[in-house]
Swiss-Prot record:
A Pfam family it matches: FSAP_sig_propep
Purpose: The native peptide is a cationic amphipathic alpha-helical antimicrobial peptide with potent activity against both Gram-positive and Gram-negative bacteria. It has weak activity against fungi and shows low hemolytic activity.
Protein name (database record): Plasticin-S1
Disulfide pattern: none
Source species of the chain: Phyllomedusa sauvagei (Sauvage's leaf frog)
C-alpha cells in the first residue's frame, strides 16, 4: 500500500512540475505582449503629438503669426 502511495505522489509531482512551468511561460508571454502594446501606444502618442505640433505651427504661419494677444 505504501508503494502505491509513493507511486501516486511521484506521478502527481511529475505532472504538476510541467504544468507549473507552462503557466510561468504563459505569464511571461502575456507580460511581453503587454509591454509591446505599451510601446506601440507610446509610439502612437508621440506621432500624434508631433503631428499636432506641426499642424499648429503651419496654421500659425498661415494665419499671420498665430493668435494675437488682446
Amino acid at each position: 500500500m505504501a508503494f502505491l502511495k509513493k507511486s501516486l505522489f511521484l506521478v502527481l509531482f511529475l505532472a504538476l512540475v510541467p504544468l507549473s512551468i507552462c503557466e510561468e511561460e504563459k505569464r511571461e508571454g502575456e507580460n511581453e505582449k503587454e509591454q509591446e502594446d505599451d510601446n506601440q501606444s507610446e509610439e502612437k502618442r508621440g506621432l500624434v503629438s508631433d503631428l499636432l505640433s506641426t499642424v499648429t505651427g503651419l496654421l500659425g504661419n498661415l494665419g499671420g503669426g498665430g493668435l494675437k494677444k488682446i
